[in-house]
């Protein structure tokens, strides 16, 4: 009686075998239901993957926004450095104009004829103009050189037309007042006279 009882106990207990089969079936069959009260591991995994994808997308978007902000900030700083002197430079153009008028008021023949202190004075004015324009260029301010070029309404202001059939119509023939740019912006357009009557461009 004792042997039979022991044999029955060691041969296997129905409850234990049933539990092992249930656990195995859950892991071997993806469609199998998880034990009552516990979340399905495949559903949990799928939810985690979706959450991970969402977080990754947010990180990428945040990184892109930060890169755009960095580029925009760098451009604003560069523009501030370049264009921060715009008002001051525009005021200084009057000084440049006066220097140029002083030099132009003396005809070329008279310049060659002068001697002594007067010659030194004229050369001093010319040197001052060159030095002043050089200093403006250091801050991005450059003179527009329109003479002989095609009229550009973005850079030039036409005051009058000059009949001339020897050049292409619309060519800048005379500069009344120098124009200047700062960086890529027009500080002041050049006031010019434009040819007409010649061949079309």
From Swiss-Prot:
Q: Which Gene3D superfamilies match?
A: 3.90.20.20, Head domain of nucleotide exchange factor GrpE
Single GO MF descriptor: adenyl-nucleotide exchange factor activity
A Pfam family found in this protein is GrpE
Specify the domain of life of the species encoding this protein: Bacteria
Q: Give GO terms for biological process.
A: protein folding
Name the segments for region: Disordered. 1-40
Compartment(s): Cytoplasm
Keyword terms:
Chaperone, Cytoplasm, Stress response
Q: Which cysteines are joined by disulfide bonds?
A: none
Q: For this UniProt entry, what's an example GO CC term?
A: cytoplasm
Q: Which residues form a coiled coil?
A: none
Asked whether the UniProt record includes Chaperone among its keywords, one would answer yes
Q: Does the keyword Cell membrane apply?
A: no
Q: Where does this protein have compositionally biased stretches of type Polar residues?
A: 1-11
Report the HAMAP family cross-referenced here. Answer: GrpE
What biological function has been recorded for the protein in this entry? Answer: Participates actively in the response to hyperosmotic and heat shock by preventing the aggregation of stress-denatured proteins, in association with DnaK and GrpE. It is the nucleotide exchange factor for DnaK and may function as a thermosensor. Unfolded proteins bind initially to DnaJ; upon interaction with the DnaJ-bound protein, DnaK hydrolyzes its bound ATP, resulting in the formation of a stable complex. GrpE releases ADP from DnaK; ATP binding to DnaK triggers the release of the substrate protein, thus completing the reaction cycle.
NCBIfam families given in the database record: PRK14141.1
* Description of how the protein assembles with itself and partners: Homodimer.
Q: Per the similarity annotation, which family is this?
A: Belongs to the GrpE family.
| Name recorded for this polypeptide | Protein GrpE
From what organism does this protein derive?
Beijerinckia indica subsp. indica (strain ATCC 9039 / DSM 1715 / NCIMB 8712)
Gene name of the encoded protein: grpE
